[in-house]
Amino acid sequence: MQLNSTEISELIKQRIAQFNVVSEAHNEGTIVSVSDGIIRVHGLADVMQGEMISLPGNRYAIALNLERDSVGAVVMGPYADLAEGMKVKCTGRILEVPVGRGLLGRVVNTLGAPIDGKGALDHDGFSAVEAIAPGVIERQSVDEPVQTGYKSVDAMIPIGRGQRELIIGDRQTGKTALAIDAIINQRDSGIKCVYVAIGQKASTISNVVRKLEEHGALENTIVVVATASESAALQYLAPYAGCAMGEYFRDRGEDALIIYDDLSKQAVAYRQISLLLRRPPGREAYPGDVFYLHSRLLERASRVNADYVEAFTKGEVKGKTGSLTALPIIETQAGDVSAFVPTNVISITDGQIFLESNLFNAGIRPAVNPGISVSRVGGAAQTKIMKKLSGGIRTALAQYRELAAFSQFASDLDDATRKQLSHGQKVTELLKQKQYAPMSVAQQSLVLFAAERGYLEDVELSKVGSFEAALLAYADREHGELLQQIDQTGAYNDEIEGKFKGILDTFKATQSW
């Protein structure tokens, strides 16, 4: 069989076309040192800041220090078996976590892996933990409320959808309790919740999850956990992972609420990583970029306009705005709000709820100090009825505090001052609320109306709590439709005012408290 030159060249071309070589270009490096969860790698020339580096044993590290002759990376997970000379590879990917509705009702770790024993996650894809916050043009002003269910917060320090409201106070002052009750109160509001637990005991987190389940709020919540026993890297990254999960709902025209419990521990974890990476320390040994650590996280909580949502969903969702509301928690030492991290976060957020240990120990719970607690944008989001009825509460408390301090030195007080002191004491008593007992807008409005219009004047101070409970039970039993109407509309007019007067007059006549 003879082949001419044309056939030979055709056969060679066919063979070349059929020849299939799979080649992957890996930027490979060598570990030169391992200590305290930090590895130094030589040879990763093309690595990006924040890139995942693949380690032996299906583990990853994140590149944080890019130096001339080596890369400093923090290991996510156990590192005891890593040694000098081991080979590592670039992945070309930034850290991503699973996102989607399938995560609701689940407990996951920083990397999005389930840790609740309920099987694999049903997710809608992955999202990078680090994302650029929406720009100025893509945002919309805050004008819808997030009801926490607490009278003192919803009346005096209202929170709006898309707001960042700091919860700050010493340890054991009820910060987590306030945040958990805010989640429980969203059961029927349509707001999806994310609870990020940073550096807490596993037993504490277990109690929180159980309480959410008992009150029917877990099915609406994603719990992201980085316990105290986990590495500093996972504690530092947990808030960003939770934020990415919350942004999934915001970008699709829905409302979400995220709790960071707490950012003080995240800052400590980041300080540990930075010092081990030999970055220069600053005030209180924190690195220079600790402000940026929190600002880039909290700026992602926002209210985005309908154009942003439509562009993101490629026209699938039209005419809907989305929001991510953040409630970061900061723990202070002996009430010192002028420390480095507290002042940073106060300057980033749109207001703060300050909880005081003195008030907490005096039995005033939630222990909100109305003097230095403020909401800078929430007032625009308050419902009409709450705005109308809550105006006098803050003033009454401020006057009461001033007079109470003055009255300690005065032996005889005139009737007007006595009356004001009595009113202030009763309002303070009225704002007390038990844990896991959030109140609806209508219930809060009725109670505030009673305080505002002087219905508590002839009620003994010790009977204020039982008066409130009996009033709400009576209103719910006899005027349930009116309360439902107020919850749905939030409106306030002469007709509702007249009905409230009628309810209180009839109830006071019964003397059943």
From Swiss-Prot:
Pfam short name (any one): ATP-synt_ab
Subcellular location: Cell inner membrane
UniProt: ATP binding residues: G169, D170, R171, Q172, T173, G174, K175, T176
TM segment ranges: none
EC number(s) stated in the UniProt entry for this protein: 7.1.2.2
GO molecular function, one term: proton-transporting ATP synthase activity, rotational mechanism
Residues of the site described as Required for activity: S373
GO CC annotations on file: plasma membrane; proton-transporting ATP synthase complex
InterPro entries to which the protein is assigned, alphabetical: ATP_synth_asu-like_sf (IPR023366), ATP_synth_asu_C (IPR000793), ATP_synth_asu_C_sf (IPR038376), ATP_synth_F1_a_nt-bd_dom (IPR033732), ATP_synth_F1_asu (IPR005294), ATPase_a/bsu_AS (IPR020003), ATPase_F1/V1/A1_a/bsu_N (IPR004100), ATPase_F1/V1/A1_a/bsu_N_sf (IPR036121)
CDD domains in UniProt: ATP-synt_F1_alpha_C, ATP-synt_F1_alpha_N, F1-ATPase_alpha_CD
Catalytic reactions of this protein: ATP + H2O + 4 H(+)(in) = ADP + phosphate + 5 H(+)(out)
Enzyme class at the top of the EC tree: translocase
Membrane-related topology note: Peripheral membrane protein
Keywords: ATP synthesis, ATP-binding, Cell inner membrane, Cell membrane, CF(1), Hydrogen ion transport, Ion transport, Membrane, Nucleotide-binding, Translocase, Transport
Function: Produces ATP from ADP in the presence of a proton gradient across the membrane. The alpha chain is a regulatory subunit.
Subunit and interaction comment: F-type ATPases have 2 components, CF(1) - the catalytic core - and CF(0) - the membrane proton channel. CF(1) has five subunits: alpha(3), beta(3), gamma(1), delta(1), epsilon(1). CF(0) has three main subunits: a(1), b(2) and c(9-12). The alpha and beta chains form an alternating ring which encloses part of the gamma chain. CF(1) is attached to CF(0) by a central stalk formed by the gamma and epsilon chains, while a peripheral stalk is formed by the delta and b chains.
Family according to the record: Belongs to the ATPase alpha/beta chains family.
Protein name per its UniProtKB record: ATP synthase subunit alpha
Naturally occurring in which organism (per UniProt): Pectobacterium carotovorum subsp. carotovorum (strain PC1)
Origin organism lineage: Bacteria, Pseudomonadati, Pseudomonadota, Gammaproteobacteria, Enterobacterales
